[in-house]
Amino acid sequence: KIVMDLVVNHTSDEHAWFEASKNKDDEHADWYWWRPARPGTTPGEPGAEPNQWGSYFGGSAWEYCPERGEYFLHQFSKKQPDLNWENPAVRRAVYDMMNWWLDRGVDGFRMDVITLISKRTDSNGKLPGEYGSELEDLPVGEEGYSNPNPFCADGPRQDEFLAEMRREVFEGREGFLTVGEAPGVTAQRNEHITDPGNGELDMLFLFEH
């Protein structure tokens, strides 16, 4: 049996999707979390980041891209820009890729940080702490950044996305396994996500419990 590691919260910054996304006129322009610098600041300079989120790997969770003139979100390394799962085209591309591997005999997927794919935004699509956002960010910590985890882990559309994945990728297939790495998920939510009746994932592993 072969269970593949699946990383779809983010891609490499060398991925063709990201390279295309640097062009605001490209069809991939909205495939990542791009944001302008804060008003009244100089793009690329400290303090111009869209909000005060810190990366899990240290420093800001935002990296300035001169080619596009905007920042992109990376919860981990700046080499790993976060995909925008709010975009149906992103989800379609992910599901097509998963089907491609299953059609070639893979037996399932171990999904890297899959519970970070849904970000919490306000009614205008703005993230907490962004200029003009209806959502307040958390206070900054000792390193000068706030914690994005409460707004990115186990987000509002996560169940919807995982159930859609189940239908689009696994419906009609037998003998497959889905295992999700689930940062920020409570034991109670674990039960919901792995309940067969909810059609999401078979198993989760949580480092917090």
Predicted regions and their residues:
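Acidic/aromatic-lined carbohydrate-recognition and catalytic surfaces
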Residues: 1-99, 103, 116-185
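Hydrophobic residues within beta-strands of alpha/beta enzymes
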Residues: 109-111
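Noncatalytic carbohydrate-binding groove/subsite architecture in carbohydrate-active enzymes
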Residues: 174, 181-209
